[in-house]
């Protein structure tokens, strides 16, 4: 005995509804991520400015112990896209974990940019480090993290 035409129609409608529902969820998630992009970029800029101010304070008081400095380079995964807030990004969590182990201040500069590629890290983020005096100045980082490549595999050159 075969499956009735009505059963096929119901199954098809259910599958179509599930597809539309799933597609709607995916679109909603993409829109949330898109709105995060600007918010997170601004939050990291504010964080970075505060970190640079703290480094300047340390410069003015050279007797104190130099903070442990982490610089993070990369793309949206480094920005924390998808996390509930920037403190849940992996660089912030890494800085927090290192801070828990060290008996000194830990500072984080996150120079990442959503949409970054290998080329853009090379042409913008590394020169930004140089411009801030982080490659050859008194505040060379103790740790540099790099997460890149997701956007590169999406290009036609790959």
Where in the sequence are the language-model features?
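Conserved SGNH/GDSL esterase-like catalytic core that processes O-acyl groups on lipids
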Residues: 79-158
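N-terminal secretory targeting modules
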Residues: 1-71, 80
